[in-house]
Amino acid sequence: MQQDNVTKKVNILGDANVDMILNLSDKQNLREPSLFSGGSSANVASGLSKLGIDVSFFGSLGKDIYGKHVVDEMKADGIDISNLVLLDNYNTAMVIGVVEESSERHFFLWPPINGAHNQYTLDDTSRKDLLDCDWLHVSGISLRFSPVKETMLEAMRICNEKSKIVSFDLNLRSELWGLSESFKETVLEAVSYSSIVFGNLHEEILLIYDGNEDTLDKHISEKQTFICRDGHNGALGITNKDKVISNAIPISPIDSVGAGDAFNTGFIYASCCGKDIEESLDIGNQVAAFKLLGSGARHLPTKELLDDFNKKYQIN
């Protein structure tokens, strides 16, 4: 990858937590559980910062040992945490991930409700800081519970009104919480404020709409792009006029936890560097493939590591 001149600033609002990973992929050589920082939004913040993007994080954690773990890692990654709030009366959430022999994963959340990440609200200072960016990224994991749901929708709306790029990862987790009509309406409201919508093609995007990939473009406004992740098939970029396909990189995955966040990281990074949709999809796939070769959602590359990865796999 050639040296890129990055000038865009990205604000990320949403979830941060810790991940406890139980890896059962090799049952003959079981490993001890591993603790990582996690959270869909925080993962993207970490990945973008490692790639040289100026990143600020907006969210809340418990004032506990796990919250300190997350804060320390964000500081080490160079993320601005001026708008990260530590709460006395709520616990930092833990996502317990079980990795199967196929590298597929299953998640369990503790506490199941009222985690600290769901309590974030904006004040006058954070609203002002929120608009100090070129790009806002959010995740649908924050649409399930109040007050962070209302906070996220407000943030998306005001950034959209100020012509900021707003990217929204659907992150429905319908296998955990279902997909009620009222929640679907909330998701569609968030989509209406979005410039870019990320999601798994079959498990999320087609679930929200009519299940027909051929008519998906009819749901996309003139100023929107849908980025459809499709596992080993790669990814699609769809506008109301065009469709671009980027093939996945053939590798043997070790751990798929956080692969979608890694893809989003690569796509946003490339877009901030001025790449077109095709090259941004390609770089999204490269960062996702790099992540798949390591454990935990934070196995994410610097620019130098990504260059080395691309040379190894002979990616131009």
Mark where each language-model region is:
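Hydrophobic beta-strand scaffold residues
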Residues: 55, 81, 166-168, 226
